Amino acid sequence: MAKQQITERRREDLLQGIERYQDLTSWPNTLHKCNIRHLCMQPIFWAPLRKTTRILTSSIAVLSLKYNAYPSDYLDKAQGSLRRPAKVFLPFFLRFLCIN
C-alpha cells in the first residue's frame, strides 16, 4: 500500500513538473510566475536549465563584447555563477529577447 502511494505521488510530481516546464517554455508571459528554485531542485529539470543557462551566459558575453563591456563584469568564471550585475542585467536581456 505504501509503495503504491509513493508511486502515485511520484507520478503526480512528474505531471506537475511537466506543467511547470510547459509554463517555463512560454517564458515571456509566465517566467516571472515560476518558482525557479523549486524547478532547480527537481532532477528532471537540470538538463534543460543547464542548457538555458549556457545559452544565456554565452549571449550575455556576446552582448557584453558588442557594447564594450567585459563579460567578467557579469560572469564569475571561476565558479560558473552569475554575479550581482548579471542579476540586474538579465531582466533587461530577457526583455530584449522578447522584443526581438
Swiss-Prot record:
Leftover remarks: Partially overlaps NAB6.
Name recorded for this polypeptide: Putative uncharacterized protein YML116W-A
Species for this entry: Saccharomyces cerevisiae (strain ATCC 204508 / S288c) (Baker's yeast)
